UniProtKB/Swiss-Prot annotation:
tRNA processing in keyword set: no
GO cellular component, one term: plasma membrane
Family the UniProt entry places it in: Belongs to the monovalent cation:proton antiporter 2 (CPA2) transporter (TC 2.A.37) family. KefB subfamily.
Record's subcellular location: Cell inner membrane
Complexes and interactors: Interacts with the regulatory subunit KefG.
Name this protein carries in UniProt: Glutathione-regulated potassium-efflux system protein KefB
SUPFAM superfamilies on file: NAD(P)-binding Rossmann-fold domains
RCK N-terminal domain: residues covered: 400-521
GO MF terms held by the record: glutathione-regulated potassium exporter activity
Membrane topology according to the record: Multi-pass membrane protein
Alphabetical UniProt keywords: Antiport, Cell inner membrane, Cell membrane, Ion transport, Membrane, Potassium, Potassium transport, Transmembrane, Transmembrane helix, Transport
InterPro entries: Cation/H_exchanger_TM, K/H_exchanger, K_H_efflux_KefB, Na+/solute_symporter_sf, NAD(P)-bd_dom_sf, RCK_N
C-alpha cells in the first residue's frame, strides 16, 4: 500500500470510527457491532473505499495483541495458577465438545474428515477481542462468569498452537529430522524468551524510567509488545500468546500501571480497526449465493456453542443468573479461525468454496453476539427485576421510590443501608448480575440494568423520585447519567460520587452541588483522629476538620475555571495553598480562644 493510500485509509478509518460508534451507541447496538457494520460499508463489498483487506486485517490483529498484553499485566503468576483448573478443565472441555459437535455437523455435509476436524477446531474458537470487550461493557470482568470466560479464552489461545501443527499432518505432509530440529529450536527460543523476560526486562525499564523522559518509556513499552509479537510470529506461534506472557512477566513489577497507561490508547484504536477489518472481510457475494446455507450454519454454530457453554456452566455450578451471559458472550466464532482456515487452505485441507463459506459464517456469528447479549440483558432484567408486574413496565417495578441509588458496590451499599435504616424507599440499579442475584437473596431491592439507558431510569421511577445517588466506578458513566437526569428529569436532585479532584471539577461544571470525594472524607476523618493522638482537644480537632473541609471546597470552586491552564494552574494552586494555610491558622486561633466543654467521651 502506497504512502498516500495508507494516509487516506488511516483518515477513513478514524472517520468511520468517529461516526459509527456514537450512532451505534445511540441505537443501543454497542460499539463492536457499529465497527463491524462500518467495515462492511467501506469494504470491497460496500462502497469499495478499501480493497486490500488482507493487509489491513493482518495489521489490525495488533489490537488483539495489545489487549492480551494488558490482560497479562493484570494477572500475576500466582493468580494464573489458581485458574489452572478452569483453564485446562472447562476450557479443554469447551474446545473438545464444540469440535466434536461442529466437526460432526460439517462431516455430515460435503466435508472430508480432515477438513471437518480442522473446521470443527476453528469454529470452536471464540473471539478474544469481542468477548473481552463485551465482558468489560457488561461489568462481567470480576464476576464468576467473566473469570470462567477468560479461562476458556486463554485455553483457546493455547489450543491454536497444536491445531496449526496438526494441519500438515492432516494434509499428509511427512516430516523429517529437520522438522523436529526446527521444533526443538522453537521450543528453545520460547524458553529463552521466558528467561530473558523474567531477568532482563525489569532492569531495562528501571534504566529507562531513570531518564525521566515519558516518551522513551512509551516507546520502550511499544517495543516490548511489538517485539514479543514479532518474535512469536517468527516461531510460528500466536502473537497474542507472546504478548500475554510478556504481560504476565511484568505483572508484579513496579511499572505495571505505567505500562497500562502507555499502551491503553493504542489498544483501543487498534481493536476498533480490527473489528472494522473483520467487517470489510465479509464476502457478500458468497453470502448472496449461499444465503440459506450460511444462515443455517450461523444459527447452528451459535446454538451449539451456547449450549455447550451453558452445560459446562451448569456442571461448574455457576449461578443461574450468570449462565446465560457466559454462554452468550463466547458463542461466536473467533479471529483465530481466520488463521487456522487460511493455513488449512494453503495445505489444501480446505478445498473450493469451503474456505469462504467458513469465513463468512464466522464473521456473521461475530455480528450476532452484541445482539444476543442485548437479548440476554432483557431476559435477565425481566427474570430478576419484574415480579408480577404488567408488561408495559419492562425493567423494574415502579412504586415511586424516594431515592434511586446507581451502583451497589461498597460505596453504594453503605449509602443504601443508611437510607433503609431511616425507612427511606429506595431503588438500587446495578449492572453486575452476580451482585444483583446475591443481594436480592439477602432481601435488598436491587435491579439489573445499565443506568446510562434512559428507559431504565424512567422505569425505575426517576420522574417521580426526589433524589438520585450515583456511585458508579467509572467517571464517564457518572457524567453520562448526570447529563441524562439533567436533560430528562430536571426536578431530580443529583448526588454523586467523585473519585478525585478531576471528577469533582467535572461535576461542579455540570452544576451538581452535592458530591463526595471518596478518599477526601475518609482521609479527613483519619487526620482528625491523628490530631487527637498528638494532643489536640477532640472538639478543636473536629473544628479543624470542618474548617479544612470548608476551605478546601472553596479552593476547589475557585480553581474550577482554570482547570485547563498548566502554568497558571500550578501558580494558582501554590497561591491557594498558602492562602488556605493563612486562613486556616487565623480561624483556628480564634477557635482556640472559645471556651469548650467537650471532652473525649463526646468524640
Amino acid at each position: 500500500m502506497e504512502s498516500s493510500a495508507l494516509l487516506t485509509a488511516g483518515v477513513l478509518f478514524l472517520f468511520v470510527a468517529v461516526v459509527a460508534v456514537p450512532i451505534a451507541a445511540r441505537l443501543g447496538i454497542g460499539a463492536v457491532l457499529g465497527y463491524l457494520i462500518a467495515g462492511i460499508a467501506i469494504g470491497p463489498w460496500g462502497l469499495g473505499f478499501i480493497r486490500d483487506v488482507d493487509a489491513i486485517l493482518h495489521f489490525s490483529e495488533l489490537g488483539v495483541v495489545f489487549l492480551m498484553f494488558i490482560i497479562g499485566l493484570e494477572l500475576n503468576p500466582s493468580k494464573l495458577w489458581t485458574l489452572r483448573r478452569s483453564i485446562f478443565g472447562v476450557g479443554a472441555a469447551q474446545v473438545g465438545l464444540s469440535t466434536l459437535l461442529l466437526g460432526g455437523a460439517l462431516y455430515l455435509t460435503d466435508f472430508s474428515w480432515q477438513s471437518a476436524l480442522i473446521g470443527g477446531v476453528g469454529l470452536a474458537m471464540s473471539s478474544t477481542a469481542m468477548a473481552l470487550q463485551l465482558m468489560r461493557e457488561k461489568g462481567m470482568n470480576r464476576s464468576e462468569s467473566g473469570q470462567l470466560g477468560f479461562s476458556v479464552l486463554l485455553f483457546q489461545d493455547l489450543a491454536v498452537i497444536p491445531a496449526l501443527a496438526l494441519i500438515p499432518i492432516l494434509a499428509g505432509v511427512q516430516g523429517d529430522f529437520g522438522d523436529w530440529e526446527r521444533i526443538g529450536l522453537k521450543v528453545a527460543a520460547f524458553l529463552g524468551m521466558l528467561i530473558g523476560g523474567r531477568y532482563l526486562v525489569r532492569p531495562l525499564f528501571r534504566f529507562i524510567a531513570a531518564s525521566g523522559v515519558r516518551e522513551v518509556f512509551t516507546a520502550a513499552a511499544l517495543l516490548l509488545v511489538l517485539g514479543s509479537a514479532l518474535f512469536m510470529e517468527t516461531l510460528g506461534l500466536s502473537m497474542a500468546l507472546g504478548t500475554f506472557i510478556a504481560g504476565i512477566l511484568l505483572a508484579e513489577s513496579e511499572y505495571r500501571h505505567e505500562l497500562e497507561i502507555a499502551i491503553e490508547p493504542f489498544k483501543g484504536l487498534l481493536l476498533g480497526l480490527f473489528f472494522i477489518s473483520v467487517g470489510m472481510a465479509l464476502n457478500l457475494g458468497i453470502l448472496y449465493t449461499h444465503i440459506v446455507k450460511i444462515m443455517v450454519a450461523v444459527l447452528v454454530l451459535v446454538a451449539v456453542k451456547a449450549a455447550v457453554l451453558y452445560f459446562l456452566a451448569r456442571v461448574n455450578r455457576m449461578r443461574r443468573s450468570e449462565r446465560l451471559q457466559f454462554a452468550g458472550v463466547l458463542s461466536q466464532g473467533g479471529e483465530f479461525a481466520f488463521v487456522l482456515f487460511s493455513a488449512a487452505a494453503s495445505f489444501n485441507v480446505l478445498k473450493g468454496e469451503q474456505l469462504p463459506l467458513l469465513l463468512v459464517t464466522v464473521t456473521l456469528s461475530m455480528m450476532t453476539t452484541p445482539l444476543l447479549m442485548q437479548l440476554i440483558d432483557r431476559i435477565l432484567a425481566r427474570r430478576y427485576n419484574v415480579q408480577d408486574v404488567p408488561d408495559e413496565k419492562p425493567y423494574v417495578e415502579d412504586d415511586e421510590p424516594q431515592v434511586i441509588v446507581v451502583g451497589f458496590g461498597r460505596f453504594g451499599q453503605v449509602i443504601s443501608r443508611l437510607l433503609m435504616a431511616n425507612k427511606m424507599r429506595i431503588t438500587v440499579l446495578e449492572r453486575d448480575i452476580s451482585a444483583v442475584s446475591l443481594m436480592r437473596s439477602y432481601g435488598y431491592k436491587v435491579y439489573y440494568g445499565d443506568a446510562t439507558e434512559l428507559e431504565l431510569l424512567r422505569s425505575a421511577g426517576a420522574d417521580k423520585a426526589r433524589s438520585i445517588v450515583i456511585t458508579c466506578n467509572a467517571p464517564e458513566d457518572t457524567m453520562e447519567i448526570v447529563h441524562l437526569c439533567q436533560q430528562h428529569f430536571p426536578n431530580l436532585e443529583i448526588l454523586a460520587r467523585a473519585r478525585g479532584r478531576v471528577e469533582a471539577h467535572e461535576l461542579l461544571q455540570t452544576g451538581v452541588r452535592h458530591f463526595s470525594r471518596e478518599t477526601f472524607s475518609s482521609a479527613l476523618e483519619l487526620g482528625r483522629k491523628t490530631l487527637v493522638t498528638l494532643g489536640m482537644h477532640p472538639h478543636q480537632a473536629m473544628r479543624a476538620q470542618q474548617h479544612f473541609r470548608r476551605l478546601d471546597m472553596r479552593m476547589l470552586r475557585e480553581l474550577m475555571p482554570q482547570l485547563t491552564g498548566d502554568v497558571a494552574q500550578i501558580s494558582r494552586v501554590k497561591e491557594a495553598r498558602r492562602e488556605l494555610e493563612d486562613i486556616f491558622q487565623r480561624e483556628m486561633q480564634r477557635e482556640r480562644r472559645r471556651p469548650s466543654v467537650w471532652d473525649e467521651d463526646d468524640e
